[in-house]
């Protein structure tokens, strides 16, 4: 096997392996949970709202705002970086006055299905009169649902998981769980009890804190809700590594799944962390929990009296959260970016679109044509020069959205003009021509050029998808072709024909058609389109008219400036561009002028793309001198 074939085979094998590995990686990511949001330390204070209104559960509590909570030390970031949220445990209160100060915070955003990992170092202990909870609720209760992830009252030592929603939502399926399902109907059709799972001992209260806390993991999908509790010394390695794998978590403490449509009954939820006192649940079961009754006939009154008169009992009624992390299937979504009005791209989220970027069709200027007073035959040299100098003569360029101002005339000649709209650059390259006339009869080209219909519009064929535009002329015997050019390409250059020159440029109107051009359609090596080789009849499009006087004749020679227009996508002005020489030869003869003038001449043109900047004084003299010498020899031979 030849060395080149062996290298090709090895390269193909490597490319195939890389492609397979990439596909596998993408497939694994789409099937695994990826971190999308995380709260820890200061972010609980900055990214959550402080609730300071009356308690919806009718508790004996005063929720304070962020300023009071921070100044009184009810919330803070610990030295270890965890978030502390406690209650007032110093003040004795009037049972008939405002309740004990506490904190309730709520996430600023709503969240939907995913995997939620909550690392808790400490939660309120098993204290009479307390009702701590970490839960979520939809915007429209009960229709959007409520999930009580961690909840307990008074001397509780086990978590109680409760779900609430509207209508009927049965989760009484036969699924393995370590907790005990005591009610399988989550909907309000059966009252406000909801579906209840009583967790294992040590999953809340004092036993939870004694083992250094632990981790709760909640997996919420269209068809089920699972909740795991892992004591501090039993946290799965995948959670510790930041790549949780719920399939390896083992049996959950709660597995709620049945005929209930979770996608319909549980909508987007906000998270809430709070500690209240007494209220509808803790107050009404105060005596049943083994707490002291000051009034045997009123558990609620007994609860309020205890909370008001025993501040020190609530020193351990605080939350200490290491972190809350949200994971979702697939890659983390990217934020949507709206491009500025001058660009045609709009970046959307990766989760919304298969392609990361959607490109709209920009509106671009119509093809521009430049006509030059013709000599009978010409030799043209193309050169590009940057930075761009102003035009030597007046030029009007028609563009659409936004319209750039017309270029003002200056005394210095230019070799190129670039009009930029957003990320697309439209460049007009000027051709310096040196002409030698070898007449068979007296030519009247100048008369023909200025005769006839002076206001005839200059035609243009709409832009081609290939990136090259063809420009037509009313005279079928002459053509002008626009050449698409890029910095690294070798464009084919076709010598343009001679057309008559109007005295003034036609004024653009609102009805002028515009061509559509997609930057992605510009090929690396532009090729003339069929329309460029055989121009279509002229269309009423805007054009650029550049009046360019010929240079003085030397030995029967003259110079003129022609142009072609380049449609090339460039990211910034280019300098010192280098082109590979390309030579094209065209022949033609002047036509009979509309004013009756006639004449004939043979013409030959050689169009050369130089390898460097040729518009210098020396280059101009050299070009004219060689052409003049050839012209002199030709005249002598004819004579």
Swiss-Prot record:
Primary residence: membrane
Secretion signal span: 1-21
Entry GO terms, CC: plasma membrane; side of membrane
One term of GO molecular function: endo-1,3(4)-beta-glucanase activity
CDD domains in the cross-refs: GH16_fungal_Lam16A_glucanase
Residues modified by glycosylation: 65
Keywords: Carbohydrate metabolism, Cell membrane, Cellulose degradation, Glycoprotein, Glycosidase, GPI-anchor, Hydrolase, Lipoprotein, Membrane, Polysaccharide degradation, Signal
Location of the GH16 domain: 26-290
Propeptide position ranges: 618-639
GO biological process, alphabetically ordered: cellulose catabolic process
Membrane topology, as annotated: Lipid-anchor; GPI-anchor
Domain of life: Eukaryota
Location of this chain's protein in the cell: Cell membrane
Biased composition (Polar residues): 339-348
UniProt region (Disordered), positions on chain: 337-384, 442-545
Keyword Cell membrane on entry: yes
InterPro entries hit by this protein: ConA-like_dom_sf, GH16, Glycosyl_Hydrlase_16
Family: Belongs to the glycosyl hydrolase 16 family.
Purpose of the protein: Mixed-linked glucanase involved in the degradation of complex natural cellulosic substrates.
Protein's UniProt name: Probable endo-1,3(4)-beta-glucanase ACLA_073210
The species this protein was found in: Aspergillus clavatus (strain ATCC 1007 / CBS 513.65 / DSM 816 / NCTC 3887 / NRRL 1 / QM 1276 / 107)
